[in-house]
Amino acid sequence: MRNSLSFQDEPIVALATPLGVGALAVVRMSGQGVFDIARKVFHKQGAPDFHLASSKGFQAHFGTIHDAQGVVDEVIALVFRSPRSFTMEDMVEFSCHGGPVVVQHLLKALIDAGCRLAEPGEFTRRAFLNGRIDLLQAEAIGEMIHARSESAFRTAVTQMQGRLSRQLEEMREKLLHSCALLELELDFSEEDVEFQNREELREDVQRLQGEINRLLDSYQHGRLLKEGVATVLVGSPNAGKSTLLNALLGEERSIVSHQPGTTRDYIEEPLLLGSTLFRLIDTAGLREGEEEVEHEGIRRSYRKIAEADVVLYLLDVSHPDYCNELSDITSLLEQASPNVQLLLVANKCDAITNPTERLAQLQAAMPQATVCGIAAKEGDGLEALKQQMSNMVAGLDKLHEASVLITSMRHYEALRRASDALENGACLVAEHAETELVAFELRSALEAVGEITGKVVNDEILSLIFERFCIGK
């Protein structure tokens, strides 16, 4: 990838819509000289001498694209003039017919006329480098495009609009003010001048740390909104996990067999309940495997359990020894995260005579669990199970409306470093430490917060962020 930190305005071009067959496709150009490039290939209908450089911004013009062989397609050319464009550069967007061959001819004509094919995320990267958006907003655009649930989409939109950016900028301004006063003291160290009362400084630092810690606390919920609730289906072989997965999805996604050990590796599929995404993970049945490949499948099951947000343990209550599994469930939870939730699903309730009593016994034996009864093969109880799953994350889909959430591990790590630095700084102030030591910690916190919005940035971070974008974004 090219050096993102150097100023770039060379003309770039890319397809901005998905490649494939459709009614329309949009090809966009940005950079210095795009109007001159367009003049070489675009002919406005009824105005052979027309030049897009003479057009006002936000105006559309109908015409044809030409290459060396002749007419390529009829298009609409939409003009954006710097700085009133997404990249803050001159831009032209061509709407053409949505066939892959048409698009290829149009792209080739523009490249032959002087454009360079854009790199992944280069349009958004230019928007960031030119000051149109900050780095957090750039990431939010990517998250909005890839959102798989309404909640994830709304959270990304909130961040794209700058709500979190404004909060972080307020923190940064406060830190910058304190750092400036401490730097003044260092400049006048021989005169023993104190520009900021130390008790007030300690209180300010602790208050800022509290704000940052509240953002850190939001990451667990933000991660669930963005990535989905990791729901691991666990149980003994032939408990009905694959049958349940297929029933929840409404399609035959997992192989169902009476032969134990059919599932050798985990299968992951998305399930949208309301506006919350669940990532259903069907795992190999927990038993002593007879083959090495089955052993590996079981090891992978345990790894997924350790990463789970919800463990959905499927229990075959028609089996005479089903109670023996309860102690196994307790041992299993010891390998899961402390915040994991247990959903104990009693399967094959249609095969017993007293399902209500059986469920009550299970609830009494496992008070930490949410207990639900189903008959997966017949589809009985599935709606109640889905409701229980939704109840376990109740309110998650509304959090983006009331709170500012952290959804990115990069943001979380930067804020954690900022919090640690502020905690160190407050302790140093309380211990009447040297001003230089306090200033170092506050500068560290300032730098960490600045990394999130791009006030402090390096090319490696930019490359990691923007290479995840599509070419035309």
UniProtKB/Swiss-Prot annotation:
CDD domains found in the cross-reference section: trmE, TrmE_N
Amino acids binding (6S)-5-formyl-5,6,7,8-tetrahydrofolate: 28, 93, 132, 473
Record keyword tRNA processing present: yes
Localization annotation: Cytoplasm
Binding of Mg(2+), residues: 242, 263
Main location: cytoplasm
Annotated cofactor note: Binds 1 potassium ion per subunit.
A GO BP entry: tRNA methylation
Domain of life: Bacteria
Keyword Cell membrane found: no
UniProt keyword list: Cytoplasm, GTP-binding, Hydrolase, Magnesium, Metal-binding, Nucleotide-binding, Potassium, tRNA processing
Molecular function GO terms recorded: GTP binding; GTPase activity; metal ion binding
Cofactor(s) listed: K(+)
Cross-referenced Pfam families: MMR_HSR1, MnmE_helical, TrmE_N
HAMAP family membership: GTPase_MnmE
Task of the protein: Exhibits a very high intrinsic GTPase hydrolysis rate. Involved in the addition of a carboxymethylaminomethyl (cmnm) group at the wobble position (U34) of certain tRNAs, forming tRNA-cmnm(5)s(2)U34.
UniProt family annotation: Belongs to the TRAFAC class TrmE-Era-EngA-EngB-Septin-like GTPase superfamily. TrmE GTPase family.
Protein's UniProt name: tRNA modification GTPase MnmE
Organism: Chlorobium chlorochromatii (strain CaD3)
Designated gene of the protein: mnmE
